[in-house]
Amino acid sequence: MHGAPTSKWDGKDLWKKYDYRALGVIGEPYFDVDFGQVFYLTDTGRCWDGYKVSVRDKIPRYQDEWVAAGLVYHATDDIIRAAEEGSLPHRIMITTHPQRWTDKRVEWVKEIFTQTIKNVVKRILIWITS
């Protein structure tokens, strides 16, 4: 729950005012997972190494450590290969955006075009705010 990358609001900020546990929410991954013990993978940017273009969907504190350890996967096949070889960490949190997945060619082309444009905009936002 992080919100749109171009929004000035971060959805996680909601929990600065409200206690999600008091509302029956069991846990909030960005707050309750120890990423020193759990590797984080997300398909943001239509790839598994989308942290480069992600404004909010990332764990900056640990990303450099994961990259230095070789935990960089671009395609799903890379993740599968690492799992088969036994080099994938045993503890992983995976965040996906299934609304972007399709096996329909026209929808897939539309999604890749749109996401490519969004990634360019996100790179610019990251550069401006760095």
Where are these regions (language model features)?
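Terminal accessory/targeting
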Residues: 1-130
